Amino acid sequence: MLIAHRPTLIEKKVSDIRSRFIIEPLEPGFGYTLGNSLRRTLLSSIPGAAVTSINIQGVMHEFSTIPGVKEDVTEIVLNVKRLVISSEIDEPFTVRLYKTGEGEVLAKDIEVPTGIEIGNGDLVIATLAKDAVFDMQLTIERGRGYVSAEQNRNDGMSLAGHIPVDSIYSPVHKVTYRVEATRAGERTDFDRLIIDVETKPSILPRDAVASAGKTLCELFGLARELNSQAEGVEFGVDSMIPESDEDLRIPIEDLGLSVRSYNCLKREGVNYVSELLGFSEQELLDIRNFGQKSADEVQEKLAELGHSLKGSVPGFDGSYFDPNYGS
């Protein structure tokens, strides 16, 4: 059985709806293989909830107008499509949006049962004039990907007064990825996969990635079932990159190194603290233009984080180091 470095996955949270996931080290070429598979799965196969049809009292079709309502039915349908819904109910169900009098009709005015949440409650659905009455039923279902209004119409929603809606089930808004070179031990040709995931408020990015991973495991498992004893690559334990140590994911830009030391390391392809720990002092000194003072500087910075170079004794004494070196 071939043994490979075990990749680690670290989440860098950008906001409540956006995270950056770093997976490394991956065998050469696997960054693009995994990145493309995850991106496609995230955009097309994550379950979500959406409105499939609406029924507005007194309205027979989407080209109607409603007395006392600023928006026509077509505009209301467009607003309904922007609803962000999370649902724990597997079967189709109907909710009601009822409001009277002058003012805005908001998404948070929808009467939802337990297990249903509206993620963008401030979304304006319609604007009412004085004495106007707005009474709308919304049918909500769970699904995946995108289903057109025409498809919803063909699926049995052509009853009088029922207006089908384009259903955007996917809770994932945007996914991008890039692949960089990274180091593992003495090899520098491994892949680092960086995936940027932005979701709707109905799901956390980490949950979306977990769902995509589960889906891919199920699909790839079909191939494995052909011969469960077939030889493959086994991922060993990579002691260089403990998942619990966030310090190892600190970019070298954040270490406060001198310009000379920083430039030498970047030219060598070193980007994170975890990669520095794969070097011995002599290996650093072998880098072009990287002298003893640069090596001492790096050891001092690592010691501040509680780490040391490969083969070095922890607790580097940097008391003699000149902090103005290389500036």
UniProtKB/Swiss-Prot annotation:
GO MF entry, a single one: DNA binding
Q: Which GO terms describe its biological process?
A: DNA-templated transcription
This protein's assembly is summarised as:
Homodimer. The RNAP catalytic core consists of 2 alpha, 1 beta, 1 beta' and 1 omega subunit. When a sigma factor is associated with the core the holoenzyme is formed, which can initiate transcription.
Q: Which family does it belong to?
A: Belongs to the RNA polymerase alpha chain family.
Q: What is known of its domains?
A: The N-terminal domain is essential for RNAP assembly and basal transcription, whereas the C-terminal domain is involved in interaction with transcriptional regulators and with upstream promoter elements.
Q: What is the lineage of its organism?
A: Bacteria, Bacillati, Actinomycetota, Actinomycetes, Micrococcales
Sorted UniProt keywords: DNA-directed RNA polymerase, Nucleotidyltransferase, Transcription, Transferase
What EC number(s) would the UniProt record show? 2.7.7.6
**What Gene3D superfamilies does the entry give?**
5' to 3' exonuclease, C-terminal subdomain, DNA-directed RNA polymerase, insert domain, RNA polymerase, RBP11-like subunit
* Positions of region (Alpha N-terminal domain (alpha-NTD)): 1-227
SUPFAM superfamilies on file? C-terminal domain of RNA polymerase alpha subunit, Insert subdomain of RNA polymerase alpha subunit, RBP11-like subunits of RNA polymerase
* Superkingdom classification of source: Bacteria
UniProt cross-references to HAMAP family, sorted A to Z: RNApol_bact_RpoA (MF_00059)
Region described as Alpha C-terminal domain (alpha-CTD): 244-327
Could you tell me what this protein does? DNA-dependent RNA polymerase catalyzes the transcription of DNA into RNA using the four ribonucleoside triphosphates as substrates.
**Reaction equation(s) it catalyzes:** RNA(n) + a ribonucleoside 5'-triphosphate = RNA(n+1) + diphosphate
What's the name of the protein? Answer: DNA-directed RNA polymerase subunit alpha
Q: Supply one GO CC term from the record.
A: DNA-directed RNA polymerase complex
